[in-house]
């Protein structure tokens, strides 16, 4: 533990860029001004937490969030392509209607919101790699 006490925390771009500049300037101008291509500025990139609060409480780890996204995608696929669920006593009458219910719409909205967050992380990863 003595080795950890001697380390200093690396400065992040969040520490370097003033809040007023973050609000007023475009991403391109911030990139040109604060991100160095020659390594002169030694600052780490930071990631803002864009996860909705309700998902953060239920799924505190990234692994749990990705597992949730996978499960909801599979469930949505099952509900979309499997057809209606038949009642065990009456095979002629479907248990679920063909129209989307409120639960399905809520599930789709939550899945799309979480997928948008993951897509932003992946887009940022592609920007940082390029």
Curated annotation (Swiss-Prot):
Keyword terms of this UniProt record: Host nucleus, Viral genome packaging, Viral release from host cell
GO biological process: viral DNA genome packaging
Compartments where located: Host nucleus
One GO CC annotation: host cell nucleus
InterPro entries, sorted: Herpes_TT2 (IPR005208)
Pfam family, one: Herpes_UL33
Highest taxon in the source lineage: Viruses
Family assignment from sequence similarity: Belongs to the herpesviridae TRM2 protein family.
Subunit structure and binding partners: Associates with TRM1 and TRM3 to form the tripartite terminase complex.
Job of this protein: Component of the molecular motor that translocates viral genomic DNA in empty capsid during DNA packaging. Forms a tripartite terminase complex together with TRM1 and TRM3 in the host cytoplasm. Once the complex reaches the host nucleus, it interacts with the capsid portal vertex. This portal forms a ring in which genomic DNA is translocated into the capsid.
Protein name as annotated: Tripartite terminase subunit 2
Species per Swiss-Prot/TrEMBL record: Human herpesvirus 1 (strain 17)
Gene: TRM2
